[in-house]
Design a protein with these regions (language model features):
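N-terminal transmembrane-helix/juxtamembrane module of multi-pass inner/ER membrane proteins
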Residues: 2-42, 62-137
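Membrane-interface helix-boundary motifs at transmembrane edges
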Residues: 2-6, 29-35, 54-66, 145-156, ...
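Transmembrane alpha-helix/helix-exit interface in multi-pass inner-membrane proteins
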Residues: 81-96, 163-188
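Membrane-interface loop-to-helix entry segments
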Residues: 122-137, 206-225, 260
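Membrane-interfacial catalytic/cofactor-binding modules of polytopic membrane enzymes
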Residues: 169-229
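Interfacial helix-loop-helix junctions of multi-pass membrane proteins
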Residues: 178, 210, 243-269
Length: 284
């Protein structure tokens, strides 16, 4: 009962997605199931951490921080799981379809021509710096909001987590990798941010889940929430949001159609999340 009283709306999203992925794996055929049983163990551990953080939550103690930040952190784990499980329904990706759409929109795909035409190692690094900044603006504006207004923070995290989870489900039924295979031809080893991004993708971001771009969706949502909270100072976040949008294409992580779709879903989920939060925040 104490857990029920302390639980917030976002906790139900985390609990559902933990169990959702676990159930999907458990109903697979035995040989396939064994390949992914580590995800079941991870999700049960995540579910346990969630319950403990809710149960142990006291005002401003360690578990209070864990409780409120855990849903956003969980997205890092669930992305890896969803992009790994994206071949359960369709063995092949829809990249050929997306590449054709991309060509219809831009003619020559932008990811093939931007870096070669600009031909600047400095701009290549700058674009990868913007792409890397995604991992900062996902957390830094939220941290400032958390320290000033926890109610608004809960609204923001609910919206972003809802967007991520529904996108992850979509990735599992519509697999796509994006033009990431072009990166080695376009960028070489680089100096700072290019090798950093190679390192990140080597550890956890193994590719997949490219359409729509959650980098674009999430950064746009962070900007929209920041605009409502910080108002005049939100332009700082806006610069990074615009930079991330350009970088997704320039750095050959996404087709143009991926990033445009990310703008649309980011805006739609911002509206949807606010509506759902206002309606259900007191129901749980």
């Amino acid at each position: 009962m104490e857990i029920r009283k302390k639980a917030i709306l976002t906790d139900y999203l985390v609990a559902f997605f933990c169990l959702f992925i676990a159930v999907i794996i458990l109903i697979l055929e035995n040989q396939t199931r064994q390949k992914y049983m580590n995800f079941v163990s991870i999700n049960l551990l995540l579910f346990l951490i969630l319950l403990i953080s809710i149960r142990m939550d006291r005002e401003r103690n360690f578990w209070h921080w864990v409780h409120l930040w855990f849903p956003l952190i969980s997205c890092l784990f669930f992305y890896v799981e969803a992009s790994t499980l994206d071949n359960l329904i369709f063995p092949n990706t829809f990249d050929s379809f997306l590449a054709k759409l991309d060509t219809q929109i831009t003619g020559t795909p932008l990811y093939k021509i931007l870096s070669p035409k600009i031909n600047s190692a400095l701009i290549d690094e700058l674009m990868h710096a913007f792409y890397f900044s995604y991992y900062i603006i996902l957390f830094l504006p939220a941290l400032f909001i958390f320290l000033k207004d926890e109610k608004f923070f809960k609204r923001m995290i609910f919206g972003i987590v809802l967007m991520f989870y529904i996108h992850y489900f979509f990735f599992m039924i519509f697999p796509s990798d994006g033009p990431i295979y072009m990166r080695d031809k376009l960028f070489g080893n680089g100096r700072i941010f290019i090798p950093i991004m190679k390192l990140i993708y080597g550890f956890g971001e193994q590719g997949g889940g490219a359409f729509p771009s959650t980098h674009v969706s999430a950064s746009l949502m962070v900007y929209l929430f920041s605009r409502n909270f910080f108002r005049r100072r939100a332009w700082i976040v806006g610069i990074f949001t615009a930079g991330i949008f350009i970088a997704t294409i320039y750095c050959s992580y996404h087709y143009t159609i991926d990033s445009l779709a990310g703008l649309i879903t980011g805006f739609l989920f911002f509206k949807l999340a606010n509506s759902l939060f206002d309606k259900y925040k007191n129901y749980f």
